[in-house]
């Protein structure tokens, strides 16, 4: 076992090991330090001393394990990066993992200070100047030396406002549609559009392989500090970073082996044993054979009163707000899928060590939360199950989702994501609003299609007025009205939960009182006086006069307007009359369900006859 693995094992037992005046010290909770562990520490004392001396970091073993590594050799990708790299090889023209943001800058922009700030950001964060070429058949991280930022500056001052808007839209769309070359070009790119001496648009484009949500907060927070300093002629106020993302990637590869890996894997294998890895949500459209990423977005808000009641319920249950929302969401998805045993994913920052908190890079991981609603428990009981599941998952969050999928050896299905098709999160990423000294900054909406990386991805944020939810869905699977309905049902479900936790899962309502009244009363109010002086085909003729171009009948991919249906029925009626059909004449109609069946019924009535339906499945002798 490598020394780094042994120290990580000690850390998992909450045994602290540190170096003080070249002497090895350790501290353990009562009853944890066995004679075997004490003997192992003694046996490996020289190795541990050498490692701690090299690390040059104090006390906590969680802080010891990530140390700077040599840049003279090829550096591996982290596990999360490796999966994105692999997906890019499968679909090199895909832009599903591209970020594009547009910031409108109003005021006296100091171009030199902005250029210095971006240059310094790229210098201090190696990941922003990293590419991913192939070496000996494997991808590696290649870090370019620091240099002045390369950016495109477009002067649009000579154009009208309408022309500037059109040019911005054109450039944004072109940037969004252009895939990255992970091996050969910078994976963070900037374009500055000058609209007037005091108005600019900054376009930022990045690939997900070098950033996550936490990284964006770092990026904009540090950009603000650097710009403020450089506009005043001051040096950078930011301390140098002791380690970089590449050091984390090397550490992760070394640490996640042996006993550490076995413990993580054994937990997840046991946790997911017997689970069907496919969530069968009913879709509005057939699932394409190969996964697509066309998306749509619907937004919802939970008001302050409901949010406060959810927080109170969480506190009373010794749970977090996320655990409560996740439990409710699992109930919702169970009701919509008909599955009692299901899994929903949730992203986590995966920055468990303070040493990686200030780093940009792709650290985020996905946890698979399993919910079992068998036996129709009360929400209180299910809530406790989810609380326990969540806590144990957090204790085993270091296993990369990519490795979990690989080790589970799931059947590959190109039509959907492996294991997790639906994501749910309550975001708590540190928020650093875009802010540059002396400027008014506004995030600009982009004229781009939404990209959906999952069937459904639900994110909530705390806002002053409660909780704001953004539901991103695959529009090749779902219609917007369906997502709106599901989102409204989630709110109704939450209201029922805070009113009575003891209700059984199956009894929790999804429909609001207004929806229940509409469904049970209004839509069932079908009693109507039938006009006794008109036949069916005559009533149909009146509808043709009122709405000739409206769709009258549809079957599978075919449809007929009222006018088209009337013309076909008239043609058939004339033919039937020529054959002697008239009043009191019975006409058999033997046809499968189709548009032609409706034409036949109307044609017979228009000819004056009466139709006799004959089942095509009847024996031939009976039909004769």
Regions found by a protein language model. Give the residues of each.
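His-Asp-centered acyl/peptidyl-transfer active-site segments
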Residues: 71, 91-98, 115, 126-127, ...
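Short, solvent-exposed loop/turn elements at beta->coil junctions and helix N-caps
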Residues: 137-139, 191-193, 282-289, 348-350, ...
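RNase H-like polynucleotidyl transferase catalytic core
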Residues: 274, 281, 344-350, 614
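Carrier-protein-dependent adenylate-forming modules in NRPS/ANL systems
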Residues: 1-244, 265, 270, 283, ...
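Membrane-interface amphipathic/re-entrant loop segments adjacent to transmembrane helices
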Residues: 285-294, 376
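DNA breakage-rejoining catalytic core of tyrosine-based enzymes
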Residues: 294-307
């Amino acid at each position: 076992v490598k020394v780094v693995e042994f120290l990580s094992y000690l850390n998992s037992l909450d045994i602290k090991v540190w170096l003080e005046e070249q002497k090895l010290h350790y501290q353990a909770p009562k009853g944890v330090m066995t004679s075997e562990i004490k003997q192992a520490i003694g046996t490996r004392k020289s190795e541990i001393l050498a490692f701690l001396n090299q690390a040059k970091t104090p006390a906590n073993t969680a802080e010891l394990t990530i140390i700077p590594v040599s840049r003279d050799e090829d550096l591996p990708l982290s596990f999360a990066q490796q999966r994105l790299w692999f997906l890019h090889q499968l679909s090199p023209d895909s832009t599903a993992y591209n970020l594009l943001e547009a910031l409108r800058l109003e005021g006296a922009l100091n171009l030199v200070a902005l250029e210095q700030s971006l240059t310094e950001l790229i210098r201090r964060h190696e990941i922003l100047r990293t590419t991913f070429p192939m070496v000996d058949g494997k991808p590696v991280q290649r870090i370019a030396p620091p240099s002045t930022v390369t950016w495109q500056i477009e002067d649009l001052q000579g154009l009208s406002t309408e022309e500037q808007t059109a040019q911005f839209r054109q450039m944004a769309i072109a940037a969004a549609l252009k895939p990255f070359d992970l091996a050969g070009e910078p994976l963070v790119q900037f374009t500055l559009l000058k609209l007037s001496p005091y108005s600019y648009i900054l376009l930022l484009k990045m690939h997900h392989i070098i950033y996550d949500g936490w990284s964006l907060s770092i990026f904009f927070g540090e950009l603000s500090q650097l710009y403020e300093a450089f506009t005043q002629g001051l040096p950078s106020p930011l301390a140098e970073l002791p380690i970089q993302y590449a050091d984390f990637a090397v550490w992760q590869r070394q640490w996640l082996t042996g006993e550490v890996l076995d413990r993580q894997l054994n937990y997840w294998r046991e946790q997911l044993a017997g689970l069907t890895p496919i969530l069968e949500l009913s879709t509005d459209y057939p699932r394409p054979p190969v996964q697509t990423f066309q998306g749509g977005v619907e937004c919802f808000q939970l008001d302050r009163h409901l949010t406060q009641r959810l927080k109170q319920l969480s506190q009373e249950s010794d749970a977090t707000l996320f655990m409560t929302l996740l439990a409710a969401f699992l109930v919702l998805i169970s009701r919509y899928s008909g599955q009692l045993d299901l899994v929903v994913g949730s992203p986590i920052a995966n920055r468990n060590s303070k040493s990686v908190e200030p780093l940009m890079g792709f650290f985020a991981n996905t946890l698979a939360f399993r919910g079992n609603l068998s036996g129709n428990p009360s929400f209180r009981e299910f809530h406790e199950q989810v609380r326990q599941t969540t806590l144990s998952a957090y204790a085993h969050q270091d296993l990369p989702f990519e490795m979990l999928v690989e080790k589970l050896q799931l059947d590959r299905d190109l039509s959907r994501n492996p294991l997790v098709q639906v994501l749910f999160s309550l975001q708590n990423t540190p928020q650093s609003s875009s802010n540059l000294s002396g400027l008014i900054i506004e995030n600009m909406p982009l004229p781009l299609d939404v990209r959906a990386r999952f069937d459904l991805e639900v994110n909530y944020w705390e806002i002053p007025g409660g909780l704001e939810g953004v539901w991103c869905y695959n529009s090749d699977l779902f219609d917007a009205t369906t997502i709106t309905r599901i989102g409204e049902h989630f709110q109704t479900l939450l209201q029922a939960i805070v009113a009575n936790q003891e209700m059984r899962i199956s009894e929790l309502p999804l429909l609001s009182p207004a929806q229940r009244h509409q469904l049970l009363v209004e839509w069932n109010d079908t009693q109507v006086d039938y006009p006794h002086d008109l036949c069916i085909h005559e009533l149909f003729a009146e509808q043709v006069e009122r709405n000739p171009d409206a769709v009258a009948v549809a079957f599978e991919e075919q449809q007929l307007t009222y006018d088209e249906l009337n013309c076909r029925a008239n043609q058939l009626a004339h033919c039937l009359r020529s054959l002697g059909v008239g009043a009191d004449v019975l006409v058999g109609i033997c046809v499968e369900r189709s548009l032609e069946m409706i034409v036949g019924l109307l044609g017979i009535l228009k000819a004056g006859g009466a139709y006799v339906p004959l089942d095509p499945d009847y024996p031939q002798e009976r039909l004769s």
